[in-house]
Amino acid sequence: MQINLITGISGSGKSVALRAFEDAGYDCVDNLPVSLLENLIQTLEGENSERVAVAIDARRGQSIAQLPSILENLRRNHQVRVVFLNADTNTLVQRFSETRRRHPLSTSAQQTQSATLIEAIDRERNLLEPLRAQAHSIDTSSLPAHALRSWIQDLLKDKPTGLTVVFESFGFKKGVPSEADLVFDVRCLPNPHYDKILRPLTGNDKPVKEFLEKIPEVISMECDIIQFIEKWLPHYIADGRSYLTVAIGCTGGQHRSVYLVNRISEHFRAQKDLIDLQLNFLDRHRELDSIPVTKL
């Protein structure tokens, strides 16, 4: 059975992610206590269910502490993927304020609402932190709902076994993605933004590609990043990781980082000798995907 566990900080978009799994034909369960997870899987096995997505209820901290060992047991007989959704505290406070909902871990009403909410968010972060290391982490701080759904759909194309390498472009002016394991700063490269013709375009467009591919520094940067990843990739595989996020950032996340993510991702996808290692590759463009349409 393919088991997809959705966890993360309340307000980070778990319901949106679960609906994306449901739209893809998965059996879905929301707000399931950890103590019932193994019983649920046994029941679904009896019903010949092949794909399930479960959003975990984090309100019982003692049960959450048992989740890593439960996942280890499930992985003996099933394919298990953990998706961890995160967002910065300011974004979470704003989302809870807009929806007027209480945080699941809110404490006493004697404190002010903002203090109670922030304390609840911090407490939940501490409870769930051990899960992040074995999860595919997505920072939804600047990510609209339609983009999160799209990212989940891309994730479903990925085999739930082996190491998944995510190449992600971003803009430093909006901050480094919290899920990044490796960060490469390419702001030192010539910027197409200063060309009036190229400014409204992106690194996906042919004129920008033609501009950047002729610059020796861009070619050198691309080669250096590839060589670094090729050197250390076997060590990340040996470490038993499920996910490795390589974030490449320029100023706005529109031209240089997008171009390099595409180029580097294409390079690794073309390496036939990596097939035996069960590697999966995803590429994302955070700022290009972050055009607001629907709030989480």
UniProtKB/Swiss-Prot annotation:
MF-aspect GO terms: ATP binding; GTP binding
Stored Pfam families: PapZ_C, RapZ-like_N
SUPFAM superfamilies: P-loop containing nucleoside triphosphate hydrolases (SSF52540)
Positions bound to GTP: 57-60
Keyword flag Cell inner membrane: no
UniProt keywords, alphabetically: ATP-binding, GTP-binding, Nucleotide-binding
Keyword set includes Coiled coil: no
Positions contributing to ATP binding: 8-15
Recorded superkingdom: Bacteria
Entry function: Displays ATPase and GTPase activities.
Protein family according to the UniProt entry: Belongs to the RapZ-like family.
Protein name according to UniProt: Nucleotide-binding protein Pnuc_1915
